Amino acid sequence: MPFLGDNPIEIGSGLGDYALEWVPHFSHFTATEADPGRLVALKERLGGHDSVDIRQMLLPTDEVNSYSGAVSYNVLEHIEDHVSALRSMARLVRPGGRIVLIVPAFPFAMSPVDIATGHVRRYTKKSMRQALTEAGLTIERLHYANALGLIGYYLATSVFRLTPKEGPMVKLYDRLVLPVTRAAERLVRPPFGQSVFAVARVSG
């Protein structure tokens, strides 16, 4: 993971799917989760890694720390006061460190699935830029990602009213289609996507 230094913190680790991929790349990694039940599962899953700290954290928080960076995938859309949450992330990171975010894109794609999973919003680049700027962060990268994923998600959840589940088709998409999409989007940034990707620098 670029941008994050050697001692990052993940906000909203859930069951640790991303953390398991990232841990080998850092000398130290802190995984956090707000939900007590998921925190127990997270500790069971990551507890065997000596380089990992696992702790409960709910944003916004007044905690101040000096992590080398912060990463949060598909969490900010659950938080009502997302600007205060971003300010909290900034206080956890030392000056000059980066915050890496992925959030779901486009309000028109808000579906019963989003609502059922606790989403209070979906983002555009404009709304993400506004939130990051209001939080006092300097934007370094901001773009849409996974254009094909948005089309598939919208058709599945809003047109056909399906509930996406882990299964053979999802795994096949992740294994075969997603890598090709990522490679293509490195060359040409799409004007839309399933997610907004952002990298922002903490002042100082």
Sequence positions of predicted segments:
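Conserved SAM-binding loop
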Residues: M1-S111, R129, A198-R201
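A C-terminal cap/extension of S-adenosyl-L-methionine-dependent methyltransferases
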Residues: V64, G149-G204
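Short glycine/proline- and charge-enriched loop/turn segments
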Residues: P107-D114, V159-P164
